[in-house]
Amino acid sequence: MEPILAPNPNRFVIFPIQYHDIWNMYKKAEASFWTVEEVDISKDINDWNKVTPDEKYFIKHVLAFFAASDGIVNENLAERFCTEVQITEARCFYGFRMAIENIHSEMYSLLIDTYVKDSNEKNYLFNAIETMPCVKKKADWAQKWIHDSAGYGERLIAFAAVEGIFFSGSFASIFWLKKRGLMPGLTFSNELISRDEGLHCDFACLMFKHLLHPPSEETVRSIITDAVSIEQEFLTAALPVKLIGMNCEMMKTYIEFVADRLISELGFKKIYNVTNPFDFMENISLEGKTNFFEKRVGEYQKMGVMSQKDNHFSLDVDF
């Protein structure tokens, strides 16, 4: 059995830290905590009223996918990963991550609620897993892995693909809107969320490196290429990015580029060997190690959480 999955009677107590790399990842997540109340979406309505019907259609469908997908990720964490993984440091990360995914889902739901006034259309978007075939296909793929009998390692890769590949093209499309100066609330929340998901992806890669018996390269490549083809179809056929003025072929290449970064992080050879076609995505977390935590998106990071100084309590201060 994998050491990180072996029964651990000490799992209820955090100290002493055994896995410092995993603990540091948890502290990074903690330092980047945010809430929806801190995102100003009041100025988005003016832009929303100006964008074309095609752009509205695209944004609504992307938000509908995102609103549902975070719930699927959380179900996997609650039903599988949180019960399987026995090391405290990883359980801390997964527990915190569930709260973050709830915030993401609330943010997307709030954006839909703000932009869309018709109650029937709102319900249609909030129930995208049942109402939209293009969203259902991605949701079904993710949900299949929650209940799969495959080992933890394979499912770890599948959910890294969900957050690293299924989200990547949609993140890029919203950053494209930012490049055009549109929807500041949507685009700022997208920065925060893409940073979070970049960290979640990095965490999956870190957990993969702690496996003594990881899935084979062939298995990993199969899962990743499957996710790539579904995401490419989603953004070039089902919900083509040309609706917002992006190039579909470049989007296909970008998704392959992101997949290569993921498989490289896992320690395997690249599959597609392509370059990033989107210059505006050069510094985005899902692409790799530009480290949003040092850059601090929107100057947003909890004060002192990542401080390296010893946390000693002292009574020798002069009053």
UniProtKB/Swiss-Prot annotation:
Residues 313-319 are annotated as: Interaction with R1. Its cofactor is Fe cation. Pfam families: Ribonuc_red_sm. Binds 2 iron ions per subunit. The keyword Metal-binding applies. Keywords: Deoxyribonucleotide synthesis, Early protein, Iron, Metal-binding, Oxidoreductase. Fe cation 1 binds at D70, E101, H104. The keyword DNA damage does not apply. It comes from the Viruses. One of its GO terms (biological process) is deoxyribonucleotide biosynthetic process. The active site is at Y108. InterPro entries: Ferritin-like_SF, RNR-like, RNR_small, RNR_small_AS, RNR_small_fam. Fe cation 2 binds at E101, E163, E197, H200. Its EC number is 1.17.4.1. It catalyses: a 2'-deoxyribonucleoside 5'-diphosphate + [thioredoxin]-disulfide + H2O = a ribonucleoside 5'-diphosphate + [thioredoxin]-dithiol. Ribonucleoside-diphosphate reductase holoenzyme provides the precursors necessary for viral DNA synthesis. Allows virus growth in non-dividing cells. Catalyzes the biosynthesis of deoxyribonucleotides from the corresponding ribonucleotides. Belongs to the ribonucleoside diphosphate reductase small chain family. This is Ribonucleoside-diphosphate reductase small chain. It comes from Vaccinia virus (strain L-IVP) (VACV).
